Amino acid sequence: MPPLQNLADSLPPYANDIALNLGSVVAETILTEPQKWGCFVASAHAVAVPRVVKAIEAAADAAGLAPDAKLAARGAAAIMAQNNVYFRAIAIMKNHQDYRALRARLRMRIVSNPGVPKDDFDLWCVAVSAINGCGDCLDAHEGALRSRGVEPVVAQTAMRIAAVVQAVSRVVAGEAAAA
């Protein structure tokens, strides 16, 4: 964890809880290692704070995340950046039923063929959708996990990782802006 320990150690005192939470989610054993590090990579790319992305990518490499899994996690962040905006917009529109009846007409082949186990990819989509606040996408990907027998604590762990990565990223970005 050295790259992430360095990141945690660099957080200001007001973010001590966040630094401790980072250590906790790194040590988490509920997810497989690829699932966990894919959640970190997808979440980092969703927030896109360069220093955090670099630290998480280095930690994922050190933990042995396979290159194809890393690319799929980045792909989850990319496709959810598109889908979360589209489906969240429809969900908050007053006349959303009219729009729900229309085909999205957006390519999203990576969702059906991510190149990694579906459970892993859906977890990464849950993490990114939590960051981006898309309830419909959270429901869709969490529902897919449940339909395959994945326990709720697994999705919860992905959301915890996403929450911590988001918080670390906001602190790092805020401190850089204030400097």
Place the predicted regions along the sequence by residue.
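Hydrophobic alpha-helical segments
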Residues: M1-A179
